[in-house]
Amino acid sequence: GRAQLAGVVRILDVGFGLGVNVAVTLEEIHRQVPDARCEWVSLEKELLPLVDLQEHWGEGKVARDLTELVSKGSFDEEFWSGRILVGDARDSLRSLNGPFDAIYLDPFSPARNPEMWSVEVMRALWEVCEEGGILSTYSSAAKARLALMAAGWEIGLGPRVGRKSSGTVASRGSVDPPLMALEEKQRRSLERRLNEETGINGCDPPSPAAGINSP
């Protein structure tokens, strides 16, 4: 995307938790593109105690950086900057300035936290995503995938971790390489349900021209 060409990668993280997404992603970006700068925004309903963070990460730079980010709400150095917006993510999304190159969607499951897996939230995420950007979530639930499809995302399989089901990866528009396709039977079932379900059926996917980040 444009941000990556400029040497800046912007990432939105819905569900900060212990900061695992932050640490793993920063390490990978720095390994692949040492000169890139990462701008990170996390949305979190309620932060975990600092002691939990420190127990998980122990000593070292990662622990120090994440502790500062959580305790102050922001962090800024040459390689990366971050900020955490605490509160209802649906409200925080309205105040965000996109576009983001990548989005992690890791709130509690659709069964435990259904409001964060609605079509409205998925559309709000679509609107702050760069054209050609990627959304990744651990969830393989039909509810999550249906909401993503209804909001205009292209969806595919995420990587399988151990015995867990593959998560879901979605893109705003086409990407290269393409997403790993769902099984045909699974995709047909989702498309049929998308057409049948009241509420989702009436929510037309936004056209590229409707997105706030269209080029």
Predicted regions and their residues:
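Class I SAM-dependent methyltransferase "Motif I" SAM/SAH-binding loop
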Residues: 12-20, 139-140
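Conserved Class I S-adenosyl-L-methionine
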Residues: 142-166
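Conserved beta-strand signature within the Rossmann-like core of class I S-adenosyl-L-methionine
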Residues: 102-104, 131-139
